[in-house]
């Protein structure tokens, strides 16, 4: 089964590109906030342990299906060894892994942070001031862009999508990896 792992900083467009990629492939989208938002709603706070358990169940059950594969989006802090461990653990469950790193200028990401699609799918981002501050803090406190040679996957593509529409980026991914 295939895994297309879409990584990048906050509001870079991981979910939106994943949505577009799902439209043009037989892959299913599992974006990071599909587990985060219900947990915040139910527990009234972020609970990483519960989010992780739910993700694990989704992966376990999805791998039992006859789907072609999954698009999974996640923010990877390259200065956090635990993030690398998690990404490798997820990737190990799949037969084929394709890693796409999206990068975009901070000014563009701050604008994307306010888009209707993002706010419709991610209730935790609707307090725009708090969401913007989280985005800036994440960037200040973590390295969210890989260094050359740091991505441990043979099938890797970095795309600067600062000026690219999500459907164009999805087409680039599909073409590069013959999805």
Regions from the PLM with identified roles:
Residues 1-4, 67-68:
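Pre-Walker A (Motif I) flank of P-loop NTPase domains
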Residues 6-8:
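Hydrophobic anchor at the beta1->P-loop junction of P-loop NTPases
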Residues 13:
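Conserved glycine(s) of the Walker
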Residues 16-63:
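Conserved substrate/cofactor phosphate-moiety recognition/catalytic segment
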Residues 55, 59, 166-174:
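Short, amphipathic alpha-helical "lid/cap" segments that border enzyme active or binding sites
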Residues 106-113:
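Switch/connector loops and helix/strand junctions flanking conserved nucleotide-binding motifs
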Residues 119-169:
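Small-molecule kinase domains that catalyze NTP-dependent phosphoryl transfer to phosphate-bearing small molecules
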């Amino acid at each position: 089964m295939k895994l297309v792992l879409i990584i990048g900083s906050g509001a870079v467009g991981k979910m939106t590109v994943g949505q577009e990629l799902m439209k043009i492939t037989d892959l299913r989208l599992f974006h990071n906030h599909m587990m985060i938002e219900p947990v915040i709603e139910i527990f009234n706070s972020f609970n990483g342990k519960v989010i992780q358990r739910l993700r694990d169940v989704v992966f376990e059950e999805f791998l039992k299906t006859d789907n072609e594969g999954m698009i999974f989006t996640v923010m990877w802090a390259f200065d956090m060894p635990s993030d690398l461990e998690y990404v490798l653990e997820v990737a190990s469950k799949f037969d084929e892994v394709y890693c796409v790193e999206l990068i975009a200028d901070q000014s563009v990401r701050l604008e994307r942070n306010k888009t209707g699609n993002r706010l419709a799918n991610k209730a935790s981002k609707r307090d725009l001031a708090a969401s913007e501050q989280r985005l800036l803090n994440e960037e200040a406190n973590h390295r969210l862009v890989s260094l050359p040679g740091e991505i441990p996957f043979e099938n890797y593509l970095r795309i600067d999508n600062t000026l690219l529409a999500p459907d164009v980026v999805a087409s680039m991914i599909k073409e590069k990896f013959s999805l």
